[in-house]
Amino acid sequence: MKICAATGNAGKLRELRRILEAQGHEVVSQKELGITLEPEETGTTFAANALIKAETICKASGMATIADDSGLCVDALEGAPGVYSARYCGHHGDDEANNDKLLENMKDVPAGKRGAKFVSAVCFILPDGKHLTCMGECPGKVAFERLAGDYGFGYDPLFIPDECGVGKTGKRPNTEGRSYAQLTPDEKDAISHRGNALA
């Protein structure tokens, strides 16, 4: 099936495309279709924002559309940055500034209290309005410093996934305390919030 990916985020597009194409779908980005709309994320939940994005871009493209709204929820910050993850620093899409703010807000939080989870809501919608939203999570913790790697985007250098359990894919790589940014794309997809939502 040919699916429009409703995102302007290059990292998210890479992951959506990689996961969906492995399932046999053809993915075209909204940019490739000439759609420059950036739906306003006014929802208070990941699922509400995913639906807003999916509906808007589906109407503009006339195609089956998939949208993801995701973020990092930190226990010590009462779930923040949550739905505001992409604009935690005050403006949208500045990964460095968002990471800086998270590290600053976590500077006095001890190792045993740094629990967090990545959450993803993925909404698939057809031009007739029928839609389905699936949720995925990955538990872990916030690192004390950036654990940069060759992969990832957003908060990936600061998030260390837990070693326990398996994702919906049934696969579990040995993450060995590595951050999302240090995992290969296949390793991350096997356990990630987005991989779980799309499984």
Predicted regions and their residues:
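Anionic-ligand binding patches
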Residues: 2-4, 10-199
